[in-house]
Every structure is written in C-alpha cells, then in structure tokens.
C-alpha cells in the first residue's frame, strides 16, 4: 500500500505527547487555535465553505426549530450510515499508527463514535419510531457515498496525518455549529432539536474535538509546504463534502 509523502515525513511525530495548554488565538467551536498553526491554516483555507454551514437552510431550520421533521429524519438515517464509515476511517489509524498511545487514541475515537455519538442518533430514532434494521434497508445517497469513499481512500493511501485531516472537518464543523446554535436564545431548549444542539455544544464533544485539533497540529509538525498542501487538499475537500451533506439532507437527495 502506497504511503503519501506527508506520512513519510510526519511519521516521526506519531508519538502522542502530553497535552499542553494552548495559547490564545482564533476561536471556532470553542476551540483555541495557536497562531500560525497547521489547523489555523487549514481553517483559513476552508473558511468560505464553513461560512456556508451556518447560513444553510437546514442548519438554520435546526436553529429556529422550523426544519421539517421529514428532512431531519432523512438526515438522521443518512448520518447514521455515514458514522459507520467515519468510524472505519479512525480504525485505519489503529493500523497505521506505530506508537501505542496513538493507536489507543484512534481506538478510543472508534468507541466514542459507535458508543457515544450514535447514542444521540438512536435516541432520535426511537422518538421517530425507526429501528436499526430499517436504517440498514436505506440506500446511502450518492453524496453520502462519495464523501465516505473519499475519506476511506485517503485513509487507505495515507498515514495518521492524512487520516486526521480527512476526519477533522466533520468533527470540527459540528463543534462550531453546536456552539453557535447553543448561543442563540432558546435554541438549545427546543423540544425536538434542542437535544441535537446540546449534544454537539456539550463539553464532552467539544473536548473530543479539541483533542483532534491538537493531534492534527502534532502530526503535521515539521511538514514541508508540499506536504502541508496535501493535508489542506484533503481538509478542504472534506469541508466541501460536509456542505454537500447538508444540501443532500435539505433536498432529500435520492
């Protein structure tokens, strides 16, 4: 299996170091970024796309409670299927990592998705009368398939740095959306959508995302400009896929 140049250069950074207190910088989703960090550069490269998340009618509908339940149901089913492949991308990290602590980090995230984030989905599925068997009878939308196949291909061809670059736009953008929506008076108290907002704005989710942001900076430390460009390419592409996912749910894409 071919390893990308970014992995070959950055593999020396696979050892997981103790978390350090991060210096003040730009804020997004509650995360503090170090000035001139890799993640700050990745965010700047994708900022026009990210602005589209918060202005998208699907996200606005969650914020003000006006989103049709039919659209949310479609999103819920597609996102539940997506999360299995999302967990598989993390699982590639267990295989690619050479440091035991990094292996544990990737493994812990697989558990967090399957046992943690999916709990929110299952709670909504119960409210909507959806069984897991019904979920697996649903065909993934083309936008969903394209997104997950791209992430999995990046994970298969690359190393830990590429894997986190592929994963991060999802985790980070949900942290941002959750934080922004929770700041809207009354949004987190909505009888139906409030639970969704609270889950992504919550401390546990935010801490998990912060750890992934820090890991991205650690794995990419010392990369050349060419190697950084590959990480940027992956992150921006996945950011575009994220925006497409919201549009897929809004239009009930078949």
Predicted regions and their residues:
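Alpha-helical bundle segments that constitute or directly flank the non-heme di-iron/ferroxidase center
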Residues: 47-52, 66-96, 116, 165-175, ...
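Active-site-proximal alpha-helical scaffolds that flank and shape metal-associated catalytic sites
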Residues: 101-207, 236, 240
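Short, Lys/Arg-enriched N-terminal segments with co-localized hydrophobic residues
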Residues: 15, 21-32
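Acidic, carboxylate-rich catalytic segments that either coordinate divalent cations
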Residues: 230-254
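Short alpha-helical hairpin
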Residues: 43-67, 86, 213-222
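Long amphipathic all-alpha helical oligomerization modules
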Residues: 202-235
């Amino acid at each position: 299996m071919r390893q990308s140049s970014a992995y070959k250069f950055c593999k020396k950074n696979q050892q997981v170091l103790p978390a350090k207190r991060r210096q003040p910088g730009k804020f997004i989703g509650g995360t503090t970024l170090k000035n001139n960090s890799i993640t700050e550069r990745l965010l700047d490269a994708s900022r026009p796309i990210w602005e589209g998340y918060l202005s998208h009618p699907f996200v606005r509908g969650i914020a003000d409670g006006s989103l049709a339940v039919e659209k949310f149901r479609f999103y819920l089913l597609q996102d539940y299927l997506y999360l299995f492949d999302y967990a598989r991308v993390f699982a590639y990290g267990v295989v690619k990592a050479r440091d035991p602590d990094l292996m544990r980090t990737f493994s812990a995230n697989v558990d967090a998705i399957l046992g943690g984030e999916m709990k929110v989905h299952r709670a909504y599925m119960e409210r909507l009368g959806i069984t897991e068997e019904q979920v697996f009878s649903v065909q993934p939308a083309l936008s969903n398939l394209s997104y997950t196949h791209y992430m999995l291909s990046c994970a298969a061809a690359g190393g830990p740095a590429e894997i986190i670059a592929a994963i991060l736009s999802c985790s980070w953008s949900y942290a941002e959306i959750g934080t922004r929506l929770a700041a809207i008076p009354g949004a987190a108290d909505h009888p139906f959508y409030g639970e969704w907002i609270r889950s992504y704005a919550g401390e546990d989710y935010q801490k998990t995302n912060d750890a992934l942001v820090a890991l991205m900076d650690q794995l990419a430390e010392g990369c050349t400009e060419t190697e950084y460009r590959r990480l940027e390419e992956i992150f921006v592409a996945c950011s575009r896929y994220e925006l497409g996912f919201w549009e897929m749910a809004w239009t009930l894409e078949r």
